[in-house]
């Protein structure tokens, strides 16, 4: 099923901008250094509307979760969920998972979730 385009996508994303990493390639090899206080970096591929993302981040405050979604109309719902719940240990990446090696160094990610 195709996601409907959201006419108010841009203002919704702007309200949740703190949860979005716009240049993840610049963090390659430095994720936990950039976001200290977390024991591990975990990755979710295809986070969609972010239900799993928000629940996982809430249940595991000691991990940092990077959630990748290439469809902004779905990702914005997840960004809103995380913002509403006040979760600080998750960030969203508006990227295609095919480019993972550009964003993460070998051995940097401890667990990958595929949804």
Which ranges hold each PLM region?
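SAM cofactor-binding core of SAM-dependent methyltransferases
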Residues: 40-98, 102
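S-adenosyl-L-methionine
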Residues: 1-43, 51-58
């Amino acid at each position: 099923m195709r996601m409907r385009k959201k006419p108010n996508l841009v203002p919704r994303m702007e309200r949740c901008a703190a949860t979005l990493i716009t240049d993840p390639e610049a963090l390659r090899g430095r994720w936990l250094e950039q976001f200290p206080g977390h024991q591990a970096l975990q990755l979710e591929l295809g986070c969609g509307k972010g239900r799993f993302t928000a629940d996982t981040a809430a249940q595991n405050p000691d991990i940092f979760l990077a959630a990748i979604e290439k469809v902004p109309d779905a990702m914005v719902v997840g960004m809103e969920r995380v913002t509403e719940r006040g979760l600080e240990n998750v960030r969203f990446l508006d990227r295609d998972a095919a480019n993972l090696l550009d964003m993460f160094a070998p051995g940097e990610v401890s667990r990958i979730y595929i949804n």
